[in-house]
Amino acid sequence: MEEVEIEVSAPGDGHPDAVALPLTEDESTPRSDGDLAAQLQQLADDGELKGELGKTTLLHTDGETNARRVVVAGLGKRADVDADAVRTAASAVARRLGDVGGTLGWTLDESLPLSADEQARAVVEGAVLGSYSPARWKTQQKSGKRIAKIVFYGASNGVEQTAARATHVAKWVNWARDLANSPPNELTPEILAARAAELAGERLEVSALDPAQIDELGMGALSAVGRASANGPRLIVLRYEPAEAKGDVVLGLVGKAITFDAGGISLKPALKMYDMKGDMAGGAAVIAGTAAVAELQLPVHILTVVAAAENLVSGESFRPGDILRAANGKTIEITNTDAEGRLVLADAMWYARREGATHLLDVATLTGAMEVALGDLYAGLFANDDAWRDDILAAAQESGDHTWPFPLHRRYRRYVDSAYADLKNSSELRQGSPVLAAEFLREFAGDGPWAHIDMAGPGFLERSRGDYYTQRGGTGYGVRLIVELAQRLAA
């Protein structure tokens, strides 16, 4: 995976292929001097310069500056400028320069309501994520050049470290996007385990349990979901145990990785079933997030557990009416085989607790109702511990992987009661289904802080949401949040 080189320099130094000048809607022209300022003013007078968010204007300088090109990048209204706006502007610039690539200069603006560090981080993330293409399976690839280097003007040397960290993390976000976009014939549970195993090294240990080992441990929920497929389930385990880790916290990350979800006997409609390859986006996020933390050598223990399976239909399928026994001993009546994500997470969370996780966070594309509630920008967050919830919310806000808190209350628990078993996997009650799913998961979270992120909306997009750093398909949601959370735990 290629990374972007970072440099801090004085304005006018070097010869970048292009320089970006941010512009808000409150200004007519960006800050500049000399002949370029006059040219920009003329364009503004002609109505060609726009500070609207995501708008770009490209100028060829003809030697009037040290750069061959200048791109004016719209940030929107000054009062609304935040990290998301800077990411959007930077990704729009990266796409505009898709045929040029090379070195991009970016002028940091101290008058914006963001620190230089915050601006630089957002610029790098926007440029790297905005350069991503999901079309690697096309036989006719578009010719283009990537941005290989970003030079920041008007910054201190501390910005360089922040920006370098951001390019590491963004690289892993794109890696997770590649996994989520992979066709299901190229990404079975076994292949996903092999992809994870490629990440093993001196600082990261990776292993996987096969179907026989899953059965031996009594993981009846995960086993049942995966048994209809010729591609059996896997439980993928990553361990990052740096000697310099601080405190006794072991961050347990649990990911749902249904590499293709047909719904089982409770079959999904044919319409858009092809997007169910993305039902492993949570698993991709926790694998990539763990790899990013290991690469950054953050001093925190992480145990990552990914439950991978295909939810298909065959003579071996589990059925509505079946009663399964999960690894923690609880029995589950199956009322809907398309509520399989919570089943595989149940056994994976048990395993994470058994292996020593003190703080659990599960990440999953779990309920369509969450997408209805929050759309494609925010994920829903549930937690059994207020302090743990607040830690995750803070990491989400800082990282740009947005979450919104939802309630957990024991009075919801009765809706997943079963007349025949300890609980049922799906309620006939349509209202509040994300909350009921979280209440189901709570039964398997064990003792200690636990949180659940339902990323059904932002994890895999049906269409572009217009911010340029995401597009149709996998977004890599959760990777940046995980790294930020690990950073906070390591502090």
Labelled PLM ranges:
Residues M1-A257:
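Short amphipathic alpha-helical segment within the helicase RecA-like ATPase core
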Residues K50, L192-A491:
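A generic structural signal for tightly packed, nonpolar segments enriched in small/aliphatic residues
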